[in-house]
Swiss-Prot record:
Residues 14-36 are annotated as: Disordered. Disulfide bonds: none annotated. This is Large ribosomal subunit protein bL27. One of its GO terms (molecular function) is structural constituent of ribosome. The N-terminus is cleaved by ribosomal processing cysteine protease Prp. Residues 1-9 form a propeptide. The lineage of its organism: Bacteria, Bacillati, Bacillota, Bacilli, Bacillales. Belongs to the bacterial ribosomal protein bL27 family. The gene is rpmA. InterPro entries: Ribosomal_bL27 (IPR001684), Ribosomal_bL27_CS (IPR018261).
Length: 96
């Protein structure tokens, strides 16, 4: 007769909880302005790690890959080919 001896091991020892329960704070990454929204120069548009979204027209890239507006205008999220995205800021024409 075949007898299986299954043992399940605890992922945490059942002793104390002082070494458990740590987690890092969220970094609040992602879009900070929506498509079509009016922004002023210097406004943060997108916080990211790496280049998930590339800078387009009138958009700069900071040291931590944050995208920011260089001029006042309207935000546009656009596609760059099949697998890339970019964000651009187009100035609004001033009416006289």
């Amino acid at each position: 007769m075949l007898r299986l001896d299954l043992q399940f091991f605890a992922s945490k020892k059942g002793v104390g909880s002082t070494k458990n329960g740590r987690d890092s704070q969220s970094k609040r990454l992602g879009a900070k302005r929506a498509d079509g929204q009016t922004v002023s120069g210097g406004s943060i548009l997108y916080r990211q790690r790496g280049t998930k979204i590339y800078p387009g027209v009138n958009v700069g890239r900071g040291g931590d890959d944050t995208l920011y507006a260089k001029v006042d205008g309207v935000v546009r999220f656009e596609r760059l080919g099949r697998d890339r995205k970019q964000v651009s800021v187009y100035p609004v024409a001033q009416e006289a």
